[in-house]
């Protein structure tokens, strides 16, 4: 959540002003629950996850209402750039070197890393992982179990994350949603 807060608030303040920043911060605080210090790992995770859902599901309509669909596209572009900054570094440099010698090896490494990065979002299985394709099967998306989360799916899963992995990791990401289940297919970019 620190990533979301450190990226979202500056975006809102830059494009909408300090008053809008205070307004979204107030909205977030109204829905956030404290993480129980004496709770189990699972309890802490569930509260933190619900807090992230609250943060994410409120920012998209907030931006859309004040900036329109073009503003939402600007926000999405800024989020992609923030993800690229967060996930850059020496490992990405090494991945680029590997890709120069073997696209399929680099893809396999990236697909495994994407699986690791996405595991906190929702439970899934990986029924297929080859040097040219990875399939992530989500039988019941945890995000969509919460009310008013269509934008997280539509903007985040269908647009922001695919742009990010294409630009930073040279991987195409396609989502195929059926109700609350989804199949994500990763392939090396051409």
How should each PLM-predicted stretch be described?
Residues 1-133, 140-156, 173-182, 189-190:
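N-terminal accessory segment detector
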